[in-house]
Amino acid sequence: MSSTYGENLKLTIFGQSHSPAIGVTIEGIPAGEKVDLDELQRFLSRRAPGKNAWSTPRKEADAPEILSGLVNGHTCGAPLTAIIRNTNTRSQDYANLAVTPRPGHADYTAEVKYGGYQDRAGGGHFSGRLTAPLCIAGGICLQLLAREGIAVVSRIASIAGICDEGELTSSTVEKDFPVVSDACGEKMRAAIAQAREEGDSVGGVVECAVFGAPAGLGDPMFGGMENRIAAALFGIPAVKGVEFGAGFGASKLRGSENNDAFSVENGKIVTETNHCGGILGGITDGMPIVLRAAFKPTPSIARTQQSVNLQSVTREELAITGRHDPCIVPRAVPCVEAAVAVAVYDALLARRKETR
């Protein structure tokens, strides 16, 4: 399985949804970097399940155990490995999936790829549970970036077609339901509650911005910042689309509308607009990096769905049990921040090598 990301900062995520533990090994962080474990725990708690009405009932503390790479609160240059114990699993809920794949999940494709040897319980290595170790890596990178004057912030841009209002700024949206407009948030929560009541689920979009990233990060073509960030984001289960700046909306504009005019502000080169999302030719231009990630509705729903029996190769109805989110978007916000932070810090390390 391909569960390793990065070049200068390299992380490998391991474990399954119902294995004894899940975790991450991070290589490339310079020795001597302070890691605030209390701050890391606060970040992980934003993603943790079982805290509210729009989350899965599965409760996990998501408390990281640092096994290596950290001495007296500072990185020591060795690979940093951390795990999170899985303490609230119910593998019996997935017993019928051996022959009947869930629509919208990776059950069928995993069966084809791994010949039935894959761990099916809770989705195994394909589970959103694996975003917890991603958030360990991302939470550490957020601390390292903050010391460089770089902030990564996100919000819920939309859920079930209901859009947030207002602008995302460099101030973190410190809310359990991270929207700028509380009125819009109430409408989104109502849509989630209705979907849950109807045995269904809804999706949405997370918007993320990186403030303070210097110009010059990234490379042309396949090493571009869009490529690096998108690769990390698509490692989050349920992400089905990523756009930067004006994104697909740019296709509706004329060049005279889409081009970001250059200007000077306090002796610094800036652009008057930011349709490019802070990236030109795969390289950051010093403006905020702005992106949006689209999340599909949670595929595990309470309604009976059409599937097939893989043994008899016949159509078969499937009723899914287990504990699932009616909408994963609120818990995905820190996951997006984590993925983006990892990608930006990896690019920052690359830039340091180039400019030595």
Where in the sequence are the language-model features?
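Glycine-rich, mobile lid/loop segments that gate access to catalytic sites or pores
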Residues: K113-M221
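Internal helix-turn-beta structural module
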Residues: K10, S300-R356
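Alpha-helical support elements that line or immediately flank enzyme active sites
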Residues: P20-G32, G128-I150, G223-A231, M287-P297, ...
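N-terminal, positively charged regions that mediate nucleic acid binding
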Residues: M1-R58
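A short glycine/serine-rich beta->alpha loop
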Residues: K10-G15, Q118-L130, A215-D219, C276-I279, ...
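Glycine-rich, N-terminal phosphate-binding loop and its surrounding beta-alpha-beta segment
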Residues: L44-P103, D107-T109
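Glycine-rich anion/phosphate-binding loop at the beta-strand->alpha-helix junction
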Residues: F14, P20, C135, G199-V202, ...
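Short acidic, glycine/tyrosine-flanked loop/strand segments centered on an H-E-D-like triad
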Residues: A98-G124, Q306-H324
